[in-house]
Amino acid sequence: MKRIFICTALAVGLGACTTKNVMESKIDLKNLDTTQKPGTDFFQYATGGWQKANPLTDEYARYGQFDALREQNREQLKALVLEQAAEKSAFGSNSQKVGDLYNMVMDSTRRNAEGTTPVKPLMQQVASIKEKSEIIPLMAKMYRVGIGGFFSTGIGTDIMNSNANQLGIYQGGVSLPEKEYYSDNDEITKNIRAKYREYIVNMFKLHGFTAEEANAKMKAVMNIETRLAAKHLSRVERRNPMNSYHKMSYAELKNTIPGIDWDRYYSILGINGIEELNLAHPEAVKEVAAIIDECPLADLIAYMEWKVIRSTSNELTDEIEAETFAFYGTVLSGKKVQQPRWKRALDVVNGSLGDILGELYVAKHFPPAAKERMTQLVKNLQIALGERIDAQEWMSAETKKAAHEKLNTFTVKIGYPDKWDDYSKLTVDPSLSYAENCRRMSEFDWEKHVAEKWGKPVDRDEWHMTPQTVNAYYNPTTNEICFPAGILQYPFFDMNADDAFNYGAIGVVIGHEMTHGFDDQGRQFDKDGNFANWWTEEDARKFNERTQVIVDFFNEIEVLPGLNANGKLTLGENIADHGGLMISMQAFKNATKNNPLPVIDGFTPEQRFYLSYSNVWAGNVRDEEIRNLTKSDVHSLSRWRVNGTLPHINDWYKAFGITEKDPLFVPEEERLNIW
């Protein structure tokens, strides 16, 4: 791990990237739709050609540049997995684990022959319950092997003391994406609930229950999940960290919710010596105690049976997996067919043994020069953000000083971790069923989680994504930004591209993650990662006033007839998109001011910067997925990450000659002006 500090002198450009005759534009003109005017629909103008050339296939609810790169990575990972599977490796070796797990998922003949037999012991454990007092201990036993329950628990950073881990208890127990799916009464949502009820009935029947039994159990499940959802915080409410922070002593927890046997629950989970914890969502957990007290034992059993059925739905027969896809894939997202089995198998291996694949992936596909280039880019972006902070006339010197301190202590992680996860204690046994191996892997993960975190300080070297992941993140409690190797490829990053391309793509990604440290959530954490106020009262008021502009703007965007974007839900990501563009353009200007880039293919460097940014968000999406994402995703839809964000960037207007006559025009006084 390396800490990168802002230099006192302005960083220069990226060496060869500003050598005119060596580096390339990398803007693919075929991606454009020049029949569209930039000021009318910039998303279509910049990406319409790509959309036309990449229509949605039946396996996708949405497909964009992120997905295209993930497909490329998939092919690379597939080759690595097949190499491991082809080796005659010793039992217990990493190669054996990778190869046998992949082969188990691929072996549909065996899984179909086994039917539901692999999970019958779990179902029998649930059915054998005689007293309500057995529910919580059973839930703990199930939880440690990957079967969900009425709520969730885990060990994570204490936001008030970022060096310490603490136990947390969180809302959970529902199988629809958000609480609104249980309560909204528009026709589309009511139809989704009806389809969900059908799905539950069909799944119980596939596990051997009669139609009458399945229908009765479905009603019990829906009643309990609806009660749980009603007490959940919404995603918007959860964006306020303090809404999910209620620290108390263990004795206070027992007094607050006496209807749950906490000693037995945590003893089974291997967590002992609890002194204090965070009851993140008290109303939801109180409702669990009320449900156990008020509902008939038969209903509680039906609910726990459902948790087994749902949690194992992709581990058994093709018929059960297809039934699950029909609801979650088709009804909720609009997909027509499942992905090929090899992709599903690869995703299982990648999700369960990610660091094994990550180490192989980095060795073969991530050149050291890419890490060096990214390190320089990050330094340049940090300098630019410092300049942007200084340029904010609305902010006091006191708050600016604290902002610089936070920026100067960013931890930057690029490419891959310095240490890899150890899987030596995990057994993948091909003599057992795939479902039984899933239980083993889940228990391994839980025991590893407890061993590494309970009673231990926060590991600031920990990575929260594998190197092959096509994404990036900012973690406020460690004040770190992370860019895995997987995203450091075209169309985000290209070693042979000029600065206009790289600053417009990966530069904005870097700036986006940096801005998260100063968005409506991140600004509430200090340089050490603690939830602490470092703003003057007046500056905080001005920040909230300014960001309300973008909330109101996105609230007015109609993403489907009768469905608007949620400006509050997406506020943090929208601020980060805006900040990423502002910071990266500043860094781009710094890098090229002494060595300006030429016009290429009729586009100025500034135009290529914004085309490169927009190209990252090229994609197509189904209406069902638009509805699902609008209700549940903190990110704006790709179209609006272009058409909703660029109209708030003054330099974009200059680059493309946008005027008040253009539909995307936003008066300057109504534009977001922050960072």
Give each language-model segment a name:
Residues 20-30:
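Short, Gly/Pro- and small/polar-rich lid/capping loops
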Residues 70, 221, 256-259, 278-282, ...:
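Intrinsically disordered, low-complexity linker/terminal regions across diverse proteins
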Residues 50-54, 176-177, 491:
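Short, solvent-exposed loop/turn elements at domain surfaces
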Residues 34-40, 45-110:
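Active-site-surrounding "flap" and adjacent substrate/cofactor-binding loops of secreted or lumenal enzymes
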Residues 1-4:
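Positively charged n-region of N-terminal signal peptides that target proteins for export
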Residues 84-376, 380:
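Noncatalytic, helix-rich "gating/capping" subdomain that lines the substrate-entry/channel surface
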Residues 15-16:
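C-terminal motif of bacterial Sec signal peptides marking the signal peptidase cleavage site
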Residues 31-52, 182, 186-205, 571, ...:
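Hydrophobic/aromatic-rich, well-ordered segments within soluble, folded domains that form packed cores
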